Swiss-Prot record:
Its main location: membrane. Residues 1-53 are cytoplasmic. This is Cell division protein FtsQ. Residues 87-155 form the POTRA domain. It comes from Bartonella bacilliformis.
Length: 308
């Protein structure tokens, strides 16, 4: 106690307690002001009568929706909802699909599950279809309430292309449609070599004016992506020049010796030089030719021996 009768406390002990009491008082006063401000803000708002019920309903609805989603039942729920709404795809009309099976089309478009007319994307469906090997163009239309119309323009197989040990079916532009399988296509031209797929159509069309030759062709072989060799059904090879191949063939055919040469035991006919035709005998013909020559030489020796 000091001289004035007041109790004196140690500053380093009681100062902290005093500040705590002061801060509590200030905070309580601050809380009251904030509460009073918020009360004045909402005091003028007219709360609807059923706001509480709506809040409770929203809470339960969101809880059920979360349970369906987390439990993995959303797909089934969507299927039932779409079906009950009447916008479920129930009819799919298809046209132009000769090579691509109907069930394959339904599968790649996801129409084998629970398609919705509303959510079905026709642009995406068209893109997916045009990525299929046999499809060149596709058109997809919605016909409400429950029908889709799919029209396809498929690629036409033009030839069988052999290259690098592989055999593929190509169209007339050289586009590779699919790997070759026996029985999948019939009566197609057979082209061989790098670059043959791009130039085969023009060459085969140009050669079609000479059916007496083309009917015997078994394979069109592209050599060095520069020129063509023709392999005939009898095993004969016709070697064509790099430039003016069709004109050279025309001259050869018009000379009237083609049919005669085709019936002989010849392995190669070389037309690469414009001023001559070079012919190579087959192995069998060459063997017979050598036998004939040897026999003639033997007879000649016998005649000479008899005359002596």
């Amino acid at each position: 106690m000091d001289s004035g009768g007041r109790i004196v406390y140690a500053l380093n002990v009681e100062k902290t307690g005093f500040l705590r009491i002061l801060s509590v008082t200030v905070l309580q006063r601050l809380y009251r002001r904030v509460f009073w401000f918020l009360f004045k803000c909402v005091a003028g708002i007219d709360v609807p009568r059923h706001a509480g019920s709506l809040a409770v309903f929203s809470f339960f609805f969101l809880s059920i929706l979360y349970s369906i989603s987390s439990g993995g039942y959303m797909n089934h729920f969507m299927k039932v909802a779409i079906s009950n709404s009447g916008f479920l795809v129930t009819h799919v009309d298809m046209s132009g699909n000769k090579r691509m099976m109907e069930q394959d089309i339904l599968k790649v478009l996801g129409l084998d599950e629970y398609p919705s007319m509303i959510s079905f994307d026709i642009d995406k469906a068209r893109f997916i279809l045009e990525q299929q090997p046999w499809v060149r163009l596709a058109d997809v239309q919605k016909i409400y309430p429950d029908r889709l119309r799919i029209s396809l323009v498929e690629r036409e197989p033009y030839a069988i292309w052999q290259h690098n040990g592989e055999m593929n079916i190509i169209d007339d532009t050289g586009y590779v449609i699919a790997p070759f399988q026996a029985g999948l296509v019939q009566n197609l031209s057979f082209v061989v070599g790098q670059g043959a797929q791009k130039t085969a159509k023009l060459f085969i069309q140009a050669l079609s004016v000479y059916p007496q030759l083309q009917n015997h062709v078994r394979a069109y072989v592209r050599v060095g992506d520069r020129r063509w060799d023709l392999f005939l059904a009898n095993g004969m090879r016709i070697m064509l020049p790099e430039n003016g191949a069709i004109e050279r063939l025309a001259s050869f055919i018009e000379q009237g010796v083609a049919e005669d040469l085709f019936s002989r035991d010849i392995s190669d006919i070389d037309l690469r030089l414009s001023d001559r035709i070079t012919v190579s005998l087959s192995d069998e013909a060459l063997t017979r030719r050598r036998a004939v020559v040897l026999e003639e030489e033997r007879l000649l020796k016998m005649l000479k021996a008899g005359s002596v």
